[in-house]
Amino acid sequence: MLRNSIAPSRGLGSLARQRAAGPWLTTSRRSLLGKRGYSKARSAGWPYESSIRPGTAVLPTRKTSCATFTSSATLRENEPNVRSPPSPSSASAITPEGVSKPPPSSPAAQGLTSPGSSVNPPEPPKTQTGAPPPPPPPPPARKAKGKFTRFLLYLVLTTGVAYAGGVWFSLKSDNFHDFFTEYVPYGEEAVLYLEELDFRRRFPNATRHINTRPAAPRDEGEKVTIPSKSGVSWKVAEKEGGSDVSQKGRHMSALDAETSRTTDKSKSAPKRPASEDKVVSETTGTKKDKSNERVPVTDTKKPAVSLDEPRKPAVPTVSSIEPLAALQDDATIQELTKIVNGLITVINADESASKLAAPLTKAKEDFLKLGEQISRIKEEALAAAKEEINNAHLEFDRSATELVRRIDEVRAEEAAQYREEFEMEREKLAHSYQEKIKTEIERANAVAEQRLRNELVEQAIEMNRKFLNDVETLVEKERGGRLSKLSELTAQVAELEKLTAGWNEVIGANLTTQQLQVAVDAVHTALESDSMPRPFINELLAVKGLAGQDPIVNAAISSINPTAYQRGIPSTSQIIDRFRRVANEVRKASLLPEDAGVASHATSYLMSKVMFKKEVSSSGDDVESILTRTEKLLEEGNLDEAAREMNALRGWSKLLSKDWLADQWMLTQAL
């Protein structure tokens, strides 16, 4: 409230600062014309926005910070709620020079107002004579660019990857190859291009040989002249005197020559692969077609040719080159022979075989010489290898003999060493046994001498005792008086007193033992008489009182569980009866696992009905064997062993017999 009251005076006082900062504000405003979002953000969070009215100018803050002054000065003119401060060139009726300076504020007001406040107080309304300038039109909304371009880019990339993957998979799968080449545009061309690249990569010299193969010279033959009236006519030509290409003549000589040349080749040439025969037949067929095409059809008259006269072949016959025969059984030579025969076959199929006959003949001779040289080298190598093997065998035999000799020497040395060590050990043992025997003899002699000395000492003592007895006897006989008789009586009385005291102790012990036995019988009676367990603490106190400080009785009483004599324990017959009931329940649960459910309990209950009771068995860890042995031990009265047998149970069986085992242990401790 205090700031709002002081705001008018502060607004008038800041006109001078506004006038000084006018050019700077204009420059900042022009530099920030394109930042509409920043002005919106500032206008949305502008403090005291409700107090700013249209038509009022907002002055810059008095904060000395450059950032605050810049933020308040960069407000745009196109905001409807925020107006820029007036400049000296404004059309307002009130000029900045005509505004009077405000009076100085009082010291109290200056002290109450903080000079660094960043809040823009509202300015009092100013009267304007002219209408406010219209706001500039808003900039056009930004179009969402990039979505269609991004979609198109992703579509092109996806299509390219899918197309490349389809081409690659077409090379791997025949079914997909058919589908891809049939339904995908330009799929067949792409696959064929990749297959051609793969073929060129595998066989780089295939196309070079095809391209560099010389073309056979074509025989154009004579010039063909077609008469003017030799065309197609509606009238069938007459045979009389006419020219027929099926008759014997010059045009048939090429066919006869080709047939004879083919027959000669089939007779002289060896067997070739089917592929080469096919190539030759195709070549022959082509030549026949060419010869047929070269047949001149003229009406010129020539001398008749006799049928008996031998005809000159149109194409001279080519002598074929004989292939190489198999020289040796070596695989390498046979492979080379196959390669040379293949070359000969290819040359025979070509028309230039006569040109290469001499080089091939020389090559065959060189190849035969090479085969003989290889055979000779192999024989020499085989002989050298045999000799080397024989030498190796001899060396091996010599080394083996030397090794056996060394082994025998080492064995002999080891045997001699072992024998020497054995003799040394035997001597050591004999010496040690001699020492032991000598020591034992010395000890035996010492013991015998000591025994003799002891016997002599005992004899001396016995002789002294006899001497004293004899002296005493003689003295007593000599006295023979009343003193000797009194001493005898005194000794007899003392012996009687001793006997009396001993008998009194024996009688007292007998009485105590009898009372203790009666108390123990009372405890047994309390345990065995009643049909229901009852406390026997009184009987136990009587036994403890009669026993006194007897450690055995006190230890036995301390070993009894306090619950047993405070609440009572069942008798032996009750334990046996209860065992029979517990045994039935244990048999029912004998087939249950540890994590059994309701179905397992029901199954075990039904199976226990059809189980047979076993006889007494000394072995076996199953439930039935343990129950049988326990029942036998209870009938014999061996409660301790019966409890140990029942303690060997596991799982639900042990859980069901837990209470019976506790009573059994308490009864065993009490008895």
UniProtKB/Swiss-Prot annotation:
Keywords: Coiled coil, Membrane, Mitochondrion, Mitochondrion inner membrane, Transit peptide, Transmembrane, Transmembrane helix. The chain crosses the membrane at residues 151-171. Residues 172-671 are mitochondrial intermembrane. It is a single-pass membrane protein. Residues 39-150 are mitochondrial matrix. Residues 121-141 have a biased composition (Pro residues). GO terms for biological process: cristae formation. It comes from the Eukaryota. InterPro entries: MIC60 (IPR019133). Residues 360-455 form a coiled coil. Its main location: mitochondrion. It is found in: Mitochondrion inner membrane. Residues 1-54, 70-144, 210-316 are annotated as: Disordered. Component of the mitochondrial contact site and cristae organizing system (MICOS) complex. This is MICOS complex subunit MIC60. It comes from Arthroderma otae (strain ATCC MYA-4605 / CBS 113480) (Microsporum canis). The lineage of its organism: Eukaryota, Fungi, Dikarya, Ascomycota, Pezizomycotina. The gene is MIC60.
